């Protein structure tokens, strides 16, 4: 699967089987490809950073609003619209993968569904801030992204030597 910026993807089960991280939002059983993931390329490593989308907007709006009330902002959840429905972009659950693990792009009537530019910009900005906080030792993301990144970078290195 070739990555295209600005779209949402589904991930192969193989990724979840490989990394074994209980904090990741896994594909649903029964062959349905959920959740969907917005993805951004890290130009330094070539890895893709996946941000799960949730349709459970009320649940995440309550968490978002509580953080805004307490801290004046919420970095880890972006509320917006995707594919004509309200959605929560869960940066608190983001993680890295290789392009190899992309299964397919999310479509509606066989057409790829883009993420609105304003949401893409907001997610990108917040992701950069979260990664900066993480690099300074702040725990803002649930998955063990350091371990996941090392697994993916090792695969990139192994594939480069094959």
Stretches found by the model and what they are:
Residues 29-33, 44-81:
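Compact nucleic-acid interaction/catalytic patches
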Residues 7-9, 48, 89-95:
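A broad, low-specificity signal marking well-ordered, structured residues that form hydrophobic/aromatic
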Residues 64-162:
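C-terminal terminal-subdomain/extension
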Residues 35-40:
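Short beta-strand-centered aromatic/proline hotspots
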Residues 3-6, 45, 86:
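Sequence-level motif detector for i,i+2 pairs with an aromatic at +2
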Residues 11-13, 41, 51-53:
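Short His-Asn-centered micro-motif
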Residues 1-33:
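GIY-YIG nuclease catalytic motif and its immediate N-terminal context
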Residues 14, 55, 99:
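Residues that form or immediately flank small-molecule/cofactor binding pockets and catalytic motifs
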């Amino acid at each position: 699967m070739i990555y295209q910026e600005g779209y949402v993807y589904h991930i192969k089960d193989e990724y979840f089987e490989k990394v074994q991280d209980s904090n990741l939002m896994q594909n649903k059983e029964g062959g349905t490809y959920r959740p969907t993931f917005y993805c951004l390329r890290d130009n330094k490593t070539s890895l893709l950073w996946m941000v799960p989308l949730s349709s459970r907007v009320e649940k995440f709006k309550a968490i978002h609003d509580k953080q805004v009330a307490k801290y004046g902002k919420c970095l880890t959840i972006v509320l917006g619209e995707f594919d004509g429905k309200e959605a929560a972009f869960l940066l608190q659950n983001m993680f890295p993968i290789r392009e190899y693990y992309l299964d397919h792009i999310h479509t509606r009537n066989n057409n790829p569904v883009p993420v609105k530019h304003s949401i893409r910009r907001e997610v990108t900005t917040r992701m950069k801030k979260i990664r900066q906080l993480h690099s300074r030792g702040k725990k803002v993301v649930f998955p063990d992204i350091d371990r996941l990144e090392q697994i993916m970078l090792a695969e990139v290195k192994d594939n480069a030597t094959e």
